């Protein structure tokens, strides 16, 4: 029997539930399947275990945006910028700023005159 990657990550989490990297791997697979709600749940677990994991904030914002929660996406990216400031991850900070600015532009374009 061939196990799916989600099944593999889930089995790994049964053994190591506090491992942020495994949660991130699970979220990545959920993202690929466009399972936004489950991916968001997994990514929230990642950042609760490791609040400095900037890539998780980036993906969480993208997942929330894809799910139609632009305000939630923007907050995730702002939280990621704070994490990048704490850790000195300047490249991640630049990317998160770009995502935030892009979302702000999209949000403004959708507002009625």
Regions found by a protein language model. Name each.
Residues 11-12, 45-46, 80:
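Canonical positions in the second alpha-helix
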Residues 15, 49, 83-87:
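Structural marker of alpha-solenoid helical repeat scaffolds
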